[in-house]
Design a protein with these regions (language model features):
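Short acidic-hydrophobic catalytic motif
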Residues: 1-164
Length: 166
């Protein structure tokens, strides 16, 4: 997998080098086609890339939103189950600021989505802040909660080391 800088408004796009045509998959919410055990995005022609969540987290945490990602197969390497390896590799290179304002979504009113015993709620806030609580039936994981605020570049120390669980 190789990451290349892209011009403003390019977005985040995966290019499947193992496919000869219809091999570009844009990383946007409407292209998410599966979220069971990992996140998969697909284009209109059925080309897909899975296990994108750790790389996408690293890119978001490092404020990278215009990048071309060349990949030789249908899955992003899972590495150690966190995004820290991606962050460290990106930190070893240089990034460039683009001469254009970033497009940022601003939550203006409360939005809540519920599905069975699960829910998510977005609330207006001047900073990026996450509160979550999760309660698994397993005694191994059970109930957990966390409060995070992403400020002053703390993504690497406060989020990137978070591991997945099975």
């Amino acid at each position: 997998m190789k990451l290349y800088p892209a011009e403003a408004d390019y977005g985040i796009k995966f290019i499947r080098k193992d496919l000869n045509k219809n091999n570009i998959i844009e990383a946007i919410w409407s292209n998410v086609t599966n979220t069971k055990l990992s996140t998969t995005i697909s284009n209109q022609n059925g080309a897909s890339v899975s296990t994108i969540e750790h790389l996408m987290s690293a890119l978001s945490g490092l404020h990278i939103d215009n990048i071309k990602i060349e990949i030789d197969g249908p899955e992003v390497p899972i590495m150690d189950g966190s995004s820290i390896k991606f962050v460290d590799l990106i930190d070893q290179t240089s990034t460039q600021s683009l001469n254009k304002r970033r497009k940022i979504l601003k939550v203006k009113k409360n939005i809540k989505v519920e599905n069975n015993d699960s829910s998510v709620e977005l609330k207006p806030n001047d900073q990026f802040s996450i509160d979550f609580e999760i309660d698994f039936p397993s005694k191994l994981v059970s109930k957990q909660s966390c409060h995070l605020q992403l400020v002053n570049g703390n993504y690497k120390t406060d989020i990137a080391l978070s591991l997945i669980h099975i």
